[in-house]
């Protein structure tokens, strides 16, 4: 049985969020939480929140044992991009892309 959790439209660049998600894929849930707690990246608290949500879903919806949970799938997809403009010299403007991410985590019982 699988338990899933996701966070959509998170204001993090997908490339930076993938660095954090790659650290927890395939690990036990307790180990993954400790890795996230000691990772000094902006995406760590967001990924930790999604992982805790997946754990809560597994426990509440499917009566799974938390000690046996493993992160089987963890991936980040690109969300919509917010486009902003920054004024530059001589009346010009440059476009700034503010990227968003969709973070998905799936846990299963081992």
Swiss-Prot record:
InterPro entries: Ribosomal_uL22 (IPR001063), Ribosomal_uL22_bac/chlpt-type (IPR005727), Ribosomal_uL22_bac/org-type (IPR047867), Ribosomal_uL22_CS (IPR018260), Ribosomal_uL22_sf (IPR036394). GO terms for molecular function: rRNA binding; structural constituent of ribosome. It holds the Pfam family Ribosomal_L22. GO terms for biological process: translation. The keyword RNA-binding applies. One of its GO terms (cellular component) is cytosolic large ribosomal subunit. Keywords: Ribonucleoprotein, Ribosomal protein, RNA-binding, rRNA-binding. HAMAP family: Ribosomal_uL22_B. Belongs to the universal ribosomal protein uL22 family. This protein binds specifically to 23S rRNA; its binding is stimulated by other ribosomal proteins, e.g. L4, L17, and L20. It is important during the early stages of 50S assembly. It makes multiple contacts with different domains of the 23S rRNA in the assembled 50S subunit and ribosome. The globular domain of the protein is located near the polypeptide exit tunnel on the outside of the subunit, while an extended beta-hairpin is found that lines the wall of the exit tunnel in the center of the 70S ribosome. NCBIfam families: rplV_bact. Part of the 50S ribosomal subunit. This is Large ribosomal subunit protein uL22. It comes from Exiguobacterium sp. (strain ATCC BAA-1283 / AT1b).
